[in-house]
């Protein structure tokens, strides 16, 4: 049973600009990652959601981290039914966009023929090979939007993920209550288990259509918990930065309640990743360090 604790970024602007967590404000990208990896043994790569990485960049991450380090890589927005900036999409994929969508500034998965969707997944998977070959790739993490509801076509899309990312540990987070409303929860978990997809447990504000309850469950050998905090005022707010949306510092009491639950979940998996996504200033790294102390 392995429990890893880390944060959802090591390059958040407010962490670098507004805190003294890193030894120096002007550290190089290499030194910053090396320092992070000296404090935690897992990180979620958030930048890959906005722009798919090159294999060369992934190779640098691989070289700059210890042998036992893990990176959970967030899937490119296009692959999770979010809009993707046109300039972030691979040229080979853009070439297959039908004429009626060719001039759009944002590209959606629904604009693409099936062959282009397959190509996009293949390009993303290819870029991650250095991490995977080194045994440092944790999960390929797909965070779906709140409009990705529990309906037949979306369930079919989930069924396609393992085939499109062969050999990788694929983890799924939902942002709509329909996946767990009524008797849907057990069905959702059974589907993920049948397809070999890891369920991402969440701690987040409740009471919204985009809220998913804090169900702790494992559907593969990899268990994942993401801590989003409880800032209800900003959870669905528009026009704000991720740092503001997840601006929440967990209290000692909250983390003390979570520690035994993390341990209990970890007993059902080979490896568990607890990721703090409260990426405002040093909130995430502070809470991650606190949880590590509680788990020791």
Language-model segments: which ranges?
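Residues lining hydrophobic/aromatic ligand-binding pockets adjacent to catalytic sites
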Residues: 1-296
């Amino acid at each position: 049973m392995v429990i890893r604790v880390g944060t959802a970024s090591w390059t958040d602007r407010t962490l670098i600009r507004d805190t003294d967590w890193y030894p120096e404000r002007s550290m190089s990208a290499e030194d910053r990652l090396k320092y992070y990896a000296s404090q935690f043994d897992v990180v979620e790569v958030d930048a890959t959601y906005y722009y798919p990485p090159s294999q060369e960049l992934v190779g640098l991450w691989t070289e700059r981290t210890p042998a036992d380090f893990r990176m959970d890589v967030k899937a490119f927005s296009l692959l999770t039914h979010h809009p993707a900036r046109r300039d972030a999409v691979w040229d080979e994929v853009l070439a297959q966009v039908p004429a009626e969508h060719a001039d759009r500034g944002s590209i959606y998965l629904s604009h693409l023929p099936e062959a282009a969707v397959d190509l996009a997944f293949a390009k993303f998977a290819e870029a991650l090979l250095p991490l995977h070959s080194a045994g440092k790739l944790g999960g390929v993490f797909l965070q779906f939007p709140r409009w990705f509801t529990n309906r037949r076509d979306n369930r079919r899309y989930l069924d396609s993920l393992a085939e499109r990312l062969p050999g990788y540990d694929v983890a799924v987070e939902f942002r709509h209550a329909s996946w767990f409303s009524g008797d849907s929860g057990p069905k959702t978990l059974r589907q993920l288990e049948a397809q070999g997809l890891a369920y991402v447990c969440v701690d987040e504000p409740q009471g919204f259509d985009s809220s998913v309850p804090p169900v702790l469950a494992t559907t593969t050998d990899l268990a994942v918990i993401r801590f989003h905090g409880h800032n209800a005022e900003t959870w669905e707010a528009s026009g704000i930065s991720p740092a503001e949306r997840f601006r929440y510092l967990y209290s000692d009491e909250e983390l003390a309640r979570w520690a035994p639950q993390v341990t209990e979940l970890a007993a059902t998996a080979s490896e568990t990743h607890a990721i703090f996504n409260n990426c405002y200033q040093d909130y995430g790294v502070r809470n991650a360090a606190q949880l590590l102390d509680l788990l020791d």
